[in-house]
Amino acid sequence: MQRSTRQQAGREAEAFALQFLQRQGLRLIEQNWLCKRGELDLVMLDGDTVVFVEVRYRRHSGWGGAMESVDFRKQEKLVTAAQLFLQHATAWANHPCRFDVIAIEGEPGNAAPLNWIKSAFDS
């Protein structure tokens, strides 16, 4: 699969995840927030809790499943990016936080299995 096709599939998976989370009552704060240490796919608000959501998509699990791709190294990058986000967006700095993962396997939007893991890891 070419890079642009993979990027498009990733964007579709993120849009699918965002719609799902909004239907669950979460509100979007930021999408694709970039910093020198990485990117936060979705920053959401669940009640008064700031939720950093990593969206992982795999068309098939031949190279490992979507959830398995959020290894310790990726978790460290997400925690660092979240810390930088909270330093930048100080309005959220005193709110409780958690890290969720949305793992999607198959074709996004076509009844693809979506697995939402709340509090997938700790900082």
Curated annotation (Swiss-Prot):
UniProt family annotation: Belongs to the UPF0102 family.
Identify the species of origin: Pseudomonas syringae pv. syringae (strain B728a)
Q: What is this protein called?
A: UPF0102 protein Psyr_4114
A GO molecular-function annotation: nucleic acid binding
